Amino acid sequence: MLDRNKNIYKYLLPNLLDVQRASYCWFLEKGFVQELRTFSVIRDYLGDLELNFATKFYTINPPRYTLEEAKRKDATYSVRIFIRAQLNYLEGADPQEKQVFLGDIPLMTDSGTFLVNGIERIIINQIVRSPGIYYKSEADKQGVRIYTASLISNRGTWVKFEIDKDDLVYIKIDKAKKFSIFVFLKALGLDNQEIFNSIENINYFRKTSNTDEQLTTEQCLLEVHSHLKPEEPATAKGCQKLLYAKFFDSKKYDLGYVGRHKLNQALMLDIDSDVRILTSLDLIGIINQLIRFRFMPIVSDDIDHLGNRRIRSVGELMANQIRIGLNRLERVVRERMAICEHSYLRVNTLVNPKPLAASIREFFGSNPLSQFMDQTNPLAELTHKRRISVLGPGGIARDRAGFVVRDIHPSQYGRICPVETPEGPNAGLIGSLSTYGKINAYGFIETPFYKVKQGKVLKDLPPIYLDAIAEEQYKLAAGDVATDEHGVLKQPDVPVRYQQNIVTVSKNEVDYIAVSPIQVVSLATSLIPFLEHDDANRALMGSNMQRQSVPLLYADAPLVGTGLESQTARDSGMAILSSNCGKVVTLSDEQIVVQDKNGNQLIYNLTKYKRSNQDTCINQKPCVSLYEKVRVGQLLADGTSTETGELAVGQNILIAYMPWEGYNYEDAFVVNERLLYDDLHTSIHIEKFEIESRQTKLGAEEITRDLPNVNEKSLSKLDENGIIHIGSWVEPGDILVGKLTPKGESDYLPEGKLLRAIFGEKSRDVRNTSLKLHHGVNGRVLDVKIFSRANQDDLSPGTNEVIKVYIAQIRKIQIGDKVAGRHGNKGIISKILPRQDMPYLPDGTPVDILLNPLGVPSRMNVGQIFECLLGLAAEHLNARFKVIPFDEMNGVEASRGFVNNTLMEAAEKQPWVFSTQHPGKMMLTDGQTGEMFDNPITVGRAYVLKLVHLVDDKIHARSTGPYSLVTQQPLGGRAQQGGQRLGEMEVWALEAFGAAYTLQELLTIKSDDMQGRNETLNAIVKGYPIPRPGTPESFKVLLRELQALCLDIAAYKIEDTTLLTEDKEINLMSELNSSRDDQSVANNYLLTRGTTP
């Protein structure tokens, strides 16, 4: 726990964005060059031409637009790659050399994002099985143990080695049948003596080699070929080529530098890291280790251990995509070399940048690891950049992931957060990097520890980072073990982690200690105070809901925090910090200029009322005054959801745990109207509306104010060009941009064509296709952006003009909005009470929110009680508290003692704050009756968030609206202004009650009986009785489907002409069946009954 005087944890967190930035820097410096080297020479099929890329001489040109310009123009923020290429004619002609354009590569911004077509995107980290060798022992159906070793490569063939029940060693390559390892080694060129000299347990291996010792290398090659390609005729030369392609061609087989590192580590080899193909030493080492594994009690490798799983970050993912693009480029170059006459070939015509550009575009546009960035608030941004997923190409499919993959593994301690993960189908598949976690050069997650020597923690030395494999050989104490002021462990016996178990050892045996108690959890979870008093399920909800909190009009930093709020705000990039010492010489709401002692000026531009990806408002405001002296790292401006450089996603609200006339039943909240009138939970939301003016076959569409058949009142808010004025207040149905589209003859109704033919009427051949504000939105026009070809803007082919209108809405809190605390205590607002009706404190202050006390015991999130009571004390002491979770090192029930002591301190100023008879509770007065409640009530200041699930975005009603063309039934969903579906279960319910007429009405005239619903509307308008329903359109669709399957089926009704005469059958779909031949119709009519006697 941190008190107000000293900070126990001196060690700062790493920069929270390093996971993204370091990986992309590696890609630009090394990864891109490595991929280029693989394709540095491209030869044609005949070997006459050769194209060389000089990988040392590639240049990166600066972006065409600045970041702000790219955002404004909806462009991609990217760099242009040029490389020197040389075309060599092997028959003797002079080589050509030229600098060629290879393609555009999106450039990462300072905040770790990519701007693609004006939209901020993020590449999330993928966790995959690491290349290397994995040993496994399992019993077959007969209970006999089979020993296997799987060699996983980074790219190319997977190989499996196996010892079967007869103690024979086999090899299995991809999906081919297994065959003797001895035959395979001989096929690679090793002779019997070389093999026997290399194998450690030669007597055991003799069983495998006995039958094949007499075979020649050529015979072995033929046998290998027959196993790998049984459908092809076996030849020794063909097998050599096949083995080369599978194991020794670096383009097709690659262990990767990680695979080589793991292989060297597992087999105790010293092969150079640049050798990424298989060697005979690898194969012999694997066989020796497998035989050792057969006899010695070695534990099978755990694939879910983080030592066997690695992170593929943005740099590696992009390098893989560059390889795909260069592969396509190589194919294109070879085809052009083969088709074109050599004398006409030029370097710049050979190298086409399109394959690489298409590959990059494909990656950013459709890869599941490239995601639309969550910009709801700064914490959501940071967490999204630190996300780790097992899904995506090369990962695990969601529907095939079992419980073992999703479960928490002991090796995740301090690396992947055990709390923060989504609820639902992705639970356990998507995680978050822990606060102190760092990804090393090989992609393994490391976490820091302090060295412990003779029971003393050496905090003066820098911490040591250990990966999951390295830490298993040490005894590691948790970060919440108590130490004295000299860093000596207080307890003689300490619980430690050792080889995935918890054991108790003496303090002198401890090797390392974690640097912080919050080392185990992620950033969002570490922002929950008193986390250790919450059930893990509720902590998970609290972590996820902090990311869904809407930025409020007035940011308010929490009274009770954990100490990480300032770093979160700083690393998110929302808070602007000074990068030089000096004096503020210019200050406005859009710009701060700081001048240093040498007269150099540094300009800091502020973002003003910009729309985020989630339609929330991004805004920054200065925190310094004119001519103020500033230091390096000092806060210059606060951003969205930050206050004085601290994360502020909610409001400190006075709450009471008490029922109120049933209105807070089942997690509902009763709130004070003060939240509404004082704008405590008011937020700004900005929506974008876009319209294009295109070039059609009948002419260009026109943006204009001159709209036919539109009254002047509807045009009053438009300027002379037909575009809405900035600052106008708009309601649903208002015209934002006037547009006319030319229409052809086919667009007219039949009666319109007739009128034109008779009278020769020359009406305007245009259709009104103006952009109107859709249902459920109103607000003020914040900005209008116009892009046109006349202004040299990049527009898609066929588009003449694009107009974007931004509308700002101020949303106050209302009934139906979702609010939550930081401990998973969420609820919907059920009633807004006048402040005079709310219960009030002894000093007359009315409570702001009433929560149901029954929501605490069963949920076991008691942290909220500690938080609200400490918040109450903080308010009266005019202080803020930073409470690090896991505080038992300070004594038993340390949280309870600390909160009680703080309340007693506050009671010196306000005696009613703390009562010895019922600590943490006080007597409240009912605002409606003026009488005191019978029992004392828990009251405090809690941090309450307004979540992005706003009722304005959810509530929906439909009277009339669009229908589906085929079924003629209303569309579904709010976006389509749809209706509610009466599904099969609802039909069953009405059938069960025997409500036949209600059901018939719902399935016909209220749904898809086209004629019936028009007649019903007419009857309602004129006051006539409701007519009888007809045939639903969906039934006709069903008949058409069956007729498409060549089933002659139709619907009939029997019409009685008289009671005693012959009945006739009338075809209900006769108007639809007019095209069918008369004989078929006659056959259908033979189903008549005889007369009644």
UniProtKB/Swiss-Prot annotation:
Q: Spell out the InterPro entries in the cross-references.
A: DNA-dir_RNA_pol_bsu_ext_1_sf (IPR042107), DNA-dir_RNA_pol_bsu_external_1 (IPR019462), DNA-dir_RNA_pol_su2 (IPR015712), DNA-dir_RNAP_su2_dom (IPR007120), DNA-dir_RNAP_su2_hyb_sf (IPR037033), RNA_pol_bsu_bac (IPR010243), RNA_pol_bsu_CS (IPR007121), RNA_pol_bsu_protrusion (IPR007644)
Per the UniProt entry, the signal peptide is none
Gene Ontology biological process: DNA-templated transcription
Localization, UniProt:
Plastid, Chloroplast
Question: The organism sits in which domain of life?
Answer: Eukaryota
Q: Which reaction does it catalyse?
A: RNA(n) + a ribonucleoside 5'-triphosphate = RNA(n+1) + diphosphate
One Pfam family, short name please?
RNA_pol_Rpb2_6
What would you give as a GO molecular function for this chain, any one? DNA-directed RNA polymerase activity
Keyword tRNA-binding among UniProt keywords: no
Q: State the GO CC annotations.
A: chloroplast; DNA-directed RNA polymerase complex; mitochondrion
* PROSITE patterns for this protein: RNA_POL_BETA
Enzyme kind, highest EC tier: transferase
What EC number(s) would the UniProt record show?
2.7.7.6
- Give the record's keywords alphabetically: Chloroplast, DNA-directed RNA polymerase, Nucleotidyltransferase, Plastid, Transcription, Transferase
| CDD domains for the chain | RNA_pol_B_RPB2
Q: What is its main location?
A: plastid
Task: Fetch the NCBIfam families from UniProt.
Answer: PRK00405.1, rpoB
Tell me the function of this protein: DNA-dependent RNA polymerase catalyzes the transcription of DNA into RNA using the four ribonucleoside triphosphates as substrates.
Q: Which family does it belong to?
A: Belongs to the RNA polymerase beta chain family.
Q: Subunit comment for this entry?
A: In plastids the minimal PEP RNA polymerase catalytic core is composed of four subunits: alpha, beta, beta', and beta''. When a (nuclear-encoded) sigma factor is associated with the core the holoenzyme is formed, which can initiate transcription.
Name of the protein in question: DNA-directed RNA polymerase subunit beta
Which species is listed as the source? Emiliania huxleyi (Coccolithophore)
